[in-house]
Amino acid sequence: MMKKLLLLAFIAVACEAMAQDAQCVPERAAMVETIRAYARIEANVLGPRSVSEHVLEAMGQTDRHRFVPGRSCSVAYMDGPVLIGQGQTISQPFIVALMTDLAAAKFDDTVLEVGTGSGYQAAVLARLVRKVCTVEIIPPLAEAAASVLKELGYDNVSVKIGDGYEG
């Protein structure tokens, strides 16, 4: 009986998460279009390179709302940084796109990210490279990020607690 109740509870939680993910699709698509618009506006600074379609696709496939407290679609995909706790923020989507693009990482690369935060940047990178090693100095953030990344199946991301200055 207890196993059945646990299974039902798990199914209910999974269904709720899937429904929320589906609800966020329009906000995620709007975020990608906002990034494209910023790239056009900043073309005089970025040059003809802009932000690659691979990066935009990765961001369009990554559930940003799963990496913010409360998992609110409107908050997660807004055009600005979002508080994630411990006095830290998840970067504005355009900044994530720009950093990811400027890294120019290739599929066979291993990337070291310093400052895991919520894990969102690592998740975006994980769609583009073979392996992401990320280091976070604030244990509660590292633990939360590792949990979300594992829950979402990012098996190519390794989260470590430590001072990124030490590598």
Locate the predicted segments by residue:
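Conserved nucleotide-cofactor-binding alpha/beta core module
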Residues: 104-167
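Positively charged n-region of N-terminal signal peptides that target proteins for export
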Residues: 1-5
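Class I SAM-dependent transferase core
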Residues: 20-112, 128, 143
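General helical structural elements
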Residues: 7-8, 32
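Residues in and immediately flanking transmembrane alpha helices
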Residues: 16-17, 65, 126, 149
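Hydrophobic h-region of N-terminal signal peptides that target proteins for export
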Residues: 9-18
